[in-house]
Structures are given as structure tokens and as C-alpha cells.
């Protein structure tokens, strides 16, 4: 059996080169505030992979994505070991674009903090009088740069995203920036409407895109997982304060309340975290993992 070594290790994912494709493995690691925590969250990698698969299938009519298969039988023998089953995705190789495409439709988190000070989120003027967790009149696109592990992503304007892309792809900066913005908002609208019908509010999320061998923009990375999105229960939604969530916010809140934890979570926080991830998956897909 041929051994495979990851060519890249991210905060949560490991990427393996499979010749004309890549194999992306979502581990059970969890990160918060750009730090990888000491604990593993059992089944988390499977939730991330299977939820991405669900959304990639759901949005294929809008634009192509990089997913080829999540069935390990389609992958080399090395990936047919138990630790890869359910949390591995074989993907097309793309030239990734250096922008994190963030879309927000509810005011929360760093956006709420910024709005309280300036009335703006990432430089975008918002209506006066919004309360925490209010729905915005329209989704807003707030791109950021992609940071290396240990660094923080930097929020940038749409105009700045044109510059960043133009530098790397001369003659295509505006074309790619426009496509990223328009695809991001279209994907969000389609998926947020579906999620609402299943009892989940998608407050905000992040997409990443790449180019295929013909220069087409293709959706890559993960899609609408509890790691890349804020999911709130529709039942009990009430603006004016922060909302309960199905995502990492629970971990972030615990870490903020326990600054001396040295990023070491107690077991009950881990158990509650995976329960929230699984509940979100089951609500959205109607399936159990």
C-alpha cells in the first residue's frame, strides 16, 4: 500500500496530493481565535465533510465546485483505513484565489462591535438604530485577505480585493473580484432560504474560490459548515442580544470566560460542541450521522 503524507496541514484540514486530484481530510481538531486547541472533537471532521458535500450538491446548478467524491472506495487504498472514512473528500485541483469571501446578513460578532463604534461594518455604512443580531436589509459582502496559520485575516474593501487579485492575475482583477462578490451573495441567498425552511438562520458565512485549468471560477474549500458559518436556531430568534448557536461560538464564549484555560477545553464543552454540530447537520439534511 502506498503511503501518503500531507502536502499541506491547515488548522483543521490535511491535504494530500493524489496526482490529478487532491484529497482533503477534515480532522477532529478545533481552532478558535486563530489558535488550534489542545482537544479533539470526535466526529467533527465527518460533520464538516458531509455538510460540505450536502451544500456542494445543493448549489451545483449555480456554479461548479471542486468536489469529486466523498466515498473512500474512489480513493487510493491508503484512504480506505477507518480514520479516513466519512471525513475525506477527493477534489479537483484549483489555483486558489487569495480572498476569503465573507457574507453577512445579520449583525453580530466583530461586525456588531464595529457598528457600535462607527455605524459601519468593514467600511460599509449600515442603517441607524440596528440592534445586536438584527437582520440587515440585504446581505453585505465583506472580503478579507487569507492569513497564514498564526496570523489574523485582514478585512478589506471590495475595491482593495480588485487590487489584490490584479496583482496576482494581471488583467483579471476586476473580473474575478466581481465574480467572487456576485457568487458569494447568490450562494448565500439560495442556501439561507433553504436553511430557514429547516429552522436555521445562517447569520454569516465564508466561501473560498479557485480557478480551474480553463480559468473558470470554481467553489473550493468547505461550504456552510459550523466552522465557516454562524448558524442560529430560528425558534426563539430575538434581536437585542447574542443568539444561541450551532457552531464554534460556544467554544469562543467559553474561552473568553476562561482566559486562563490555556486553550484546553473541559470534556463537557467538547460534548456540547459536537452535539451542536450534529444537530445542525441533522436539521439541515434530514439525515443522521
Locate each region found by the language model.
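A long amphipathic alpha-helix within ATP-dependent nucleotide-binding catalytic cores
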Residues: 169-203
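Conserved metal-phosphate-binding beta-hairpin within the catalytic cores
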Residues: 103, 202-223
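Anionic ligand-binding catalytic core segments
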Residues: 117-120, 125-175, 219, 223-284
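Intrinsically disordered, low-complexity acidic/polar segments
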Residues: 33, 112, 214, 228-230
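Coil-to-beta-strand transition motifs
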Residues: 21, 96-98, 198-202, 214-217
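Active-site loop/lid in soluble adenylation, ligation, and acyl-transfer enzymes
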Residues: 1-148, 261-289
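Surface-exposed helix-capping loop/turn segments at secondary-structure junctions
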Residues: 60-66, 190-202, 215, 285-289
